[in-house]
Amino acid sequence: MAKGSSQGSRSPSQLIDGRIEELGDWRGQTLSRLRALVKEADPDVVEEWKWRGVPVWYDAGMICTGETYKSVVKVTFAKGAALKDPSGLFNSSLDGNTRRAIDFFEDEKIDEKAFKTLVRAAVTLNKSKA
């Protein structure tokens, strides 16, 4: 993000674009690809910018967040504990009753088909409870 730029005048999608550009490394590339997969899985998805800089995707409720850390890009599914995960993508936040997360590490290949299946399942769950 450019110094002095106002977050208030930028849309959530523009803020996410800025975060991806700001990262400028494998984390930005990974977040960008995961974002594209969410949009492919759910063309009606709405992007938000929450909690001082976390991309969040919604459709009839929160689907997932995209957090970036020094050594991991974490996608947390808000209702992940209620989702079937036959491909075993969930590898983080496994002990809770509600959320589940996937930690993506540098040079890790994304199972795109399985990821999009989880996104679609999360949307279906949200819509069933709406």
How would you describe each model-predicted region?
Residues M1-A130:
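Charge-dense, helix-prone N-terminal extensions
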